[in-house]
Amino acid sequence: MPYFIDMYNKAELVIVPSERMYQRLVEEGLTVKKYVVQKMWDFNVHMDLHTPSFERKLYFLGDVSRFPFFQNWQYDTPLHAFGNHNSDYDYSKVHFGGWLNKTELLLELSKGGFGLVWGNQEDPKDEKVYYKMNCSYKLASYLSAGIPVIVPDYLSNADFVKEKGIGFVVSSLEEANEMIQNCTEDNYNQMVTNLKHVQYLINNGYFTKKLFVDTIMALD
């Protein structure tokens, strides 16, 4: 960390994924006073996606081998994943869609369901610290596709999800399953409607453009 802090301290301004990250860097020795918070990733999407339909299923993006919960998925909500998986484990409760490029992936996600953002649970304490400071790329992927999300209550963007009404903020996978099973079609469609504006912003580079403008203004 000292190497990076020394490098950052040569800058006039730093761009951080969250407010908590800036505070952590200050604790590590950062002296730069000017900073801008990223908040969200963008996608450049120039195609028509589906309007999500109500389905009680979860999508997950990531290297399955790094996430133990795949190995004993026993919930009523079907779990769908993309990419390769280790044949040494029993994934009978998980549906694998194979590898898809960005265009194919967004089209598939946009058909309906929920997007899951979750940690690998290898070190629960460090995981919470990481997600409190990190800006989740998975979250932006699901929102870009226009589907509601399931996120842990310690995620840096959890308040954003709750305030916008674009998904469920939960404390466990058990609660995630319960929320989806109790969700009605009307509830789901309302979340999809709430998501339209956020989806438009992400798919048209709003957050990156705002980041540049905020940076220039802060340096002026």
Where are these regions (language model features)?
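Nucleotide-sugar donor phosphate/pyrophosphate-binding loop at the beta->alpha transition
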Residues: 1-6, 43-44
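Alpha-helix capping/helix-boundary segments
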Residues: 20-22, 65-66, 156-157, 175
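A charged, aromatic-enriched C-terminal amphipathic alpha-helix characteristic of glycosyltransferases
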Residues: 171-174, 178, 185-218
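A short acidic/histidine/glycine-rich donor-binding loop in glycosyltransferase catalytic cores
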Residues: 164-170
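Nucleotide-sugar-dependent
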Residues: 103, 107-144, 151-159
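Conserved catalytic-core segment of nucleotide-activated headgroup transferases in glycan assembly
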Residues: 41-110
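A short, active-site helix/loop in glycosyltransferases that binds the activated sugar's phosphate group
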Residues: 4-5, 9-34
